[in-house]
Amino acid sequence: QVMASGGWIGLGWPRAHGGRELPVSLQVAFHEEYARAGGPGRMGHIGETLMAPTLIDFGTPEQQARFLPGIREGKVFWCQGYSEPGAGSDLAAIRTRCWLEDGKWHLQGQKVWTSLAHESEWIFVIARSTPGSVGRDGLSFLLVPLDQPGVEIRPIRQMTGEAEFNEVFFDGACTAADCIVGAPGDGWKVAMALLGYERGLSTLGQQMHFSHELQLLVDAAHACGADQDLSIRRRIADAWIGLRTLRANALRIFARGEAAVGPEALVYKYAWSNWHRNLGELAMDVMGTAGDLEAQEDPLRRLQQVFFFSRAD
């Protein structure tokens, strides 16, 4: 809400929706400088960078008027209801069902790996609205309030010790008939557009966080003498080169003027995940045997966190 009071939410949104409508170059500058300064993760980033662009592109004027102000003011938080126990990388295998009855959409099913569900007021959900449909067909994109009977949220304890992810169960949950984005059956199209926004400009800020992690690793290598190992020095150099390459490729994509760039952005995320996983492995090798047991103090604790979190990228 402090960021919102200064007008730092929705930088790229059209002015008609309360944004600043800044050009890509200035959005890049903001995200990188925010991360460079060590700014914390923002609770409302799912609403700001995923839900809001989706509503702007696919939502009705009534949906935009209802939901965008809460996101822009930092008062309403959203989470993403995509993955299921049997539908992760094969997202089209979704089994959560929804049906329209008595003026409401009713939901039955389960979502998993739902980031920040325990802190959110709303969830956007892909559910199967056409009985007997398979794959990408027959899916709908719903906006569902979480504070209601029929919704149960169970935290998932991570190996980092945190519980950022959750399981979300729908058993008799419902939402209003007009809380559907696009037409019934358009869910796949809307969901894929949203994933394009997910690889948008804020990822440049993520690279700056990666730069902080790399510097932490370099400092630790100096402190413990691991930098005397030629193979460690070579891998540190490779990590530095890889990070600069990621940034150059991201800027090249965004220079074309599109903040949501579809398949190219997904390939970029694949490269980012591989880079971060390699950094996590390097962190463990720099720590050596000191990293084998759970650390309670920095920098070992933070390096272990890098390794743990990189497993899920």
Protein language model regions, located:
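Internal helix-loop-helix
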Residues: 4-65, 69-75, 116-122, 243, ...
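Glycine-rich phosphate/pyrophosphate-binding beta-alpha loops
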Residues: 87, 112-117, 159-160, 312-313
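Secondary-structure edge/capping motif, primarily at the C-terminal ends of alpha-helices
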Residues: 220-225, 250-258, 286
